[in-house]
Amino acid sequence: MSMKISEKKFNDRVGDGIQDSFMRGAVSSAQTRLYTNRLKAADELGNWEEWRELGEQIRQHTLENLDYYLMQLSENVSKRGGHVYFAKTKEDAAKYIQDVAKKKQAKKVVKSKSMVTEEISMNHALEEIGCEVLESDLGEYILQVDNDPPSHIIAPALHKNRTQIRDVFKEKLGYENSDDPYEMTKFVRKQLREKFMDAEIGVTGCNFAVANTGSLCLVTNEGNADLVMSIPKTQIAVMGMERMVPTMEELDVLVGLLCRSAVGQKLTSYVTVAGPIQEEEVDGPEEFHLVVVDNGRSQILGSEFRSILQCIRCAACVNVCPVYRHVGGHSYGSIYSGPIGAVLTPLLGGYDDYKELPYASSLCGACTEACPVKIPLHDLLLKHRQVIVEQEGRAPLAEKLAMKMFSMGASSAALYKMGSKMAPAAMSPFTSGNRVSKGVGPLKNWTDIREFPAPSKERFRDWYKNHKKGGDK
């Protein structure tokens, strides 16, 4: 899988999402639960806004000094016996991982949940050279078995219910028991445990890399990442270049913010800080590789969208977004959905495929208020729209013509006067009472679901003339 998860056009994807009543119900229920849990966890911590401020300061400081911390990380990982590779593009990253697998003559690879490995199409790259890649995260495993893309950053199978999951297991894996979550989890665990022992390479993502220790931090609730890091003899960790913290002190703050914002917990079940195996340690990989992925991030770092790199992938913005609630994750056409996806995906994937995403927002600002590191998401969405129109010239033709006509009319007193006189008569065939009932052209999408007031028969300038001081009416 790559960052792009659908070849359908944006409107078709949105239409599919709106028509999927189960998905909408599941998303609504999950959003409510996760939102409520996040508020409760934040209240328990106390001084939440101060913690958000601290999180923002840590992320901004790290980005301002990213080159220094990346080199410090590289030096410390190397000192501990690991190998570090800086990948400029997603192709570079995938090629390096292929080369490691070829060198090890690996046939089986097991991996934990990682967005950046999806971004670089790692699974496809390994399958090209004959490797079997097994997802060990339960949600990702369900989707892998069903050949279905993720719909949420932290809950990838959110759009499926347990009956659908049972049917997938029955059809693809021969599962014969009920749709009880415990029974299905036990079945999957047995499947995965057997394959863990045979895997030559384990691949993980990285929630945060600690510069001054050369350590990686992984945050999970299933414990699968610990097995991926400890059983295979070779480990490959893949991280976006921005996922840095200077020291363990900053890690402590950000992990607390991440867990509370993502799932409403003080800590997840497993928070693992590890790296290359040391002489005194009894388990861990014999060989460790860290792949640091740029893939456009350095360009973002030097742009007006820089603050999006503060993201810690908690999905708090997704869990409060009213647009996501109604259309679901697949409508975004990317592994990154919700407000974070609407900002980040066009930066990584370009406007050709994703120019509609910045408009998939009501600009209510709920995402900005929810973000634990205070990314101004709705401002960045507006900035995208400005770039699309003013710099890229990608506004729809109808919109360009409409704005040109408005500009001509608004800048000419004679044209404006004539237009305001003609508007009521021109709109009368589409008017019922004092409302436009049937929109024309661009207005149709609006009037299909909203009321639109009909032009007043009495112009304001006429009303004012009749009611101004000294008037007769």
UniProtKB/Swiss-Prot annotation:
Pfam families: Fer4_8 (PF13183), LUD_dom (PF02589), LutB_C (PF11870). This is Lactate utilization protein B 2. It comes from the Bacteria. Is involved in L-lactate degradation and allows cells to grow with lactate as the sole carbon source. Has probably a role as an electron transporter during oxidation of L-lactate. The gene is lutB2. Belongs to the LutB/YkgF family. [4Fe-4S] cluster 2 binds at residues 321, 364, 367. One of its GO terms (molecular function) is metal ion binding.
